[in-house]
Amino acid sequence: MKYLRSLMQQFVTACKNQAKLIQQFTLSLLYLFIIHIVALLFFFLFRLVLFTSIDYQFPPDIQNNFLMQATAFIKGLWFDNVIACYILLLPLVILWITALCNYHSKWVFRFISIFFILFYSLSFIISAANIPYFSYFFKTINSSIYNWFGYGATTAGMVLGETSFYFPIFLGLISILLLSGSVLRLSSYFYHLINSKSTSISPINRLCIFATGAVCIGLCLFGIRGRMGYNPIRVSQAYYCTDPFLNQLGVNPVFNLLTSTLDDNRKENRYLHLMPEQEAITNMQSILQRKGIEGISPIAREVKCAA
């Protein structure tokens, strides 16, 4: 009888330990999920600020159509989730592997915190910059901004000298500070919570964690792809009506900048090098019998008015 009671106690203890281990991984997933939701809320905030600050007059058939306008925010959530899943993938894989190894170190959570803060800070800077960019060019920020990098001092003077840019800059900085504080607090809280439930791991636990993690990673990859069709999500998926502002409002600026940069670097869109550039210039100067004008063009010529 004592042996049976001892066996039952060992079984109950083992079940509790296995439940704790599963709970550890569940807490890790909850930690990532909360950060994911917080980031989506910030992306929504940037879109709402753009919507309310833009000086745009809707057509009469759309001006009072709340459902039509709200659809842009739903589309925006779709695109925001794609970017958030890109950022989520690496931390998810890391916590999955550490859970399989039953390894929960402080440096892991510290690295994940820095990773989230770094990439979401960059995303928020782009989202904040998109507000004045859209106001001036009436299009979502794209790879054309790289053209301004060659004029650093001029660009900085334009940004800092324009008072209308101060609010987006302030919004971006506040968002970064709030997200950084939230991520650090969540990381510290869940690290201590997970380590308070430390226990050994069994093959069954590893199998459960492996299956759960694989499903979550699969869902994250699907979130990155954005749709079930043959092609992954594209900017054109945001277009749903005849209004140009609403069609562009749903596009995440980080997504648009990323995809436009990748498109620029495609083989068919690269700069053509049919022959050495200097050789081509020399040939054209010889054919046109021009020496060019320095600072203007290698084939420019001076035209003087007849007296």
Over which residues does each language-model region extend?
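Detector for methionine-enriched segments
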Residues: 1, 8, 68, 158, ...
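Membrane/wall-proximal cationic-aromatic binding patches
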Residues: 165, 250-307
